[in-house]
Amino acid sequence: MVADDIEVVTKSWSGTPAVRWLCHADGSYELFPAERETHGTDVILHIAADEEEFLNAQKLRDMLEKYCSFMPTEIYFTDEDAEADKEEKSENSESREDGSADAKTAEKPINDTHPLWQKSPSECTPDDYKAFYRKVFHDYRDPLFWIHINADYPLNFKGILYFPRLDNEYESIEGQVKLYYNQVFVADNIKEVIPEYLLMLKGVLDCPELPLNVSRSYLQNNTYVSKVSAHIVKKVCDKLNSLCNTDRENYESVWDSIKTFVEYACMRDRKFYDRAKDAILLTLTDGSHVTVEQYSEKAKADGHVAPAEEGKDPVVTVYYTTDRELQAQYIALFEAQGIQIAVLDKLVDTQFVQMLESYDATVKFQRIDADPAAALKADGDVTENQTLVELFRKASGNDKLEVRFEALKDASLPAMLTVSEQSRRMEEMMKLYAMQTGGKEQAPLFPLEYTLLLNTASPLISKLTALVAEGAPEDASGKAELIAEQIWRLSVLAQRKFTADELKNFLAGSFDILTKL
């Protein structure tokens, strides 16, 4: 306790004599008659010597504002030292020449006895919600949207949850959900009351059914708490679905800001996913948004779905990019065929798509550089050429390079470097694990599996085939090697960034070609 002694002087309305109750630190107490002119109660704390910090006016005000900002009874705070200084300055002020007393400014309570969450949603305007948000959380930015909860019996709790605005992906997404008991602050971010994955939100919850002094063990084993938590999840999902269905334009405008939150929540709680799955959007390269179902319907309508196996539903491939600039060539090829490309450029996206695939067997995700031939190949026979295989293995410096031959619909592209979807996901997972554990990134146990895809419909590949054919001119071999090296380097450049040595060799090879023109 902060006080050695506590005095309570009280007088009832009935006019009976006042009573003074004095309690000591050892638990003993005394009762005395007292003098008090009006009815009411005074509580006087005699602060202990080692707790004198609680005599500081600013500390007391901070404590009152933290715990009692919304108490239903008005609280007035007076700093007697500050008031005395103010009166002394006022008496000496030159402005009081006639000696008359100025009207004393009416005192204002430090608390709001009618907080916004106690009102009906129909009584609150958007400006009310925004003002309350700025007041409580000291954020100068307006929230994206909010959820006003007014649960009746048997849950009997109220609150407002806000989706905060984030300016960039590196900004902290840790939220703040304040728990109140009959408008008295209890604690922040109690994960037993609100699921951990919802703690990225900001808001207030007033649960009068909870005891003021809550303990973790009590909350973990309390049926009421689990029902409150489930109801909050339901209200959040209902809000997402409502915005997606009835206010789609606004929902799409805020999707990029809430995308990480929704994906993380879906991964943490299958029930959340089941309720909110229809509100999950895919951002496309043209800036538009579609649901997974809408993407699937268009792919089926356009004939971009492989025939289904007997007795099974067709599997729709959702093609995506992780870097619109680096993978621009692949994007152009797909868009030329009318295939939509989703943008999944966040760290959490890799884990999220794996979760979606595990929940829905009719959908799979594939980056556009994994196996583009499946979507871009043309009809017709393809003839493999082992001489070209050896030529490109030599050009790449990798005698185990896998080389495939396909006839693509776009004849202008001679070759593409593809990377296995599974090996790339494994590498990304290892990088993410190293970031989470704070450890040093290790060399991958399974290196990325690259495949060079040669487009047999390309005139350049046809020319290269002729240069390595039997009966070609004597200088054809040197030209073939020069062309193969340049095709390989351009394929690498379209797939990833060059290393320092690769860049040096690319520049040297390009200059060599120019000198021979």
Segments and roles (model prediction):
Residues 1-2:
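Conserved ATP-binding N-box helix of the HATPase_c
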